[in-house]
Amino acid sequence: RGGNNSLYLADVKFTSVFLEGTKGFDAILPEAAECRLAGFFDKPELTSNTKLLYVHGAADDYTLPKPCEDYVKKIKSAPGQVEIDMKEGWYHGFHYGQKPKKYKAMTVSKCPAFFVDNEGYVVGDEWPELVLNKYKLYSSIDEFYDTAQIEPKKAWKTSFKMLKKEKCLDRGVTIGGNHMDEYMPQFINFFKENLL
């Protein structure tokens, strides 16, 4: 479940830890992921046998569509292996069966992006600068990585407090939609075409 999990499982660097070779799921359909702060690989590569359809509401103000469109476009893959469908006027939760309405949910779209290299180390200087120098949360980058691996919940809570101090968190999103009947044929047909 979830767009983030689907995108993790689509990457050969992730699946190769559990499976031999470059193959993974035959079909993956991520929806409305949070692509800037999820810790995705900076140089994503799709598993060799996977067909991926990425769907996102173009009006989504909770998990922004543009960063995900950009991320999915840079996934290394064979021609025709990846398709992106941005749904005009659709919000987050476009298939919830309820009229879109405002919620005070928190967003992170103004916070520094967090991507990792093939070894799992953060890409760029922004996060190390924040956690080591500006807020002095860790004495070294190794301590930061160790905490993230050994105590991920603690590392996230510490980072979240830092993001609050950075004033990059925001509140107020639109969630909902009655697009299930419109979307379901595309959803079902994608899996029929790629699994049967």
Predicted regions and their residues:
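Short glycine-enriched nucleophile-adjacent loop
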Residues: 3-18
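Short, flexible micro-motifs
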Residues: 5, 35, 60, 92, ...
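Sec-exported extracytoplasmic/periplasmic mature domains
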Residues: 10-14, 76-77, 192-196
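Glycine-rich, phosphate-binding/catalytic loops in enzymes
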Residues: 14, 70-73, 103
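The feature captures the conserved acid-bearing segment of alpha/beta-hydrolase catalytic domains
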Residues: 20-89
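C-terminal catalytic histidine-bearing segment of alpha/beta-hydrolase fold enzymes
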Residues: 81-196
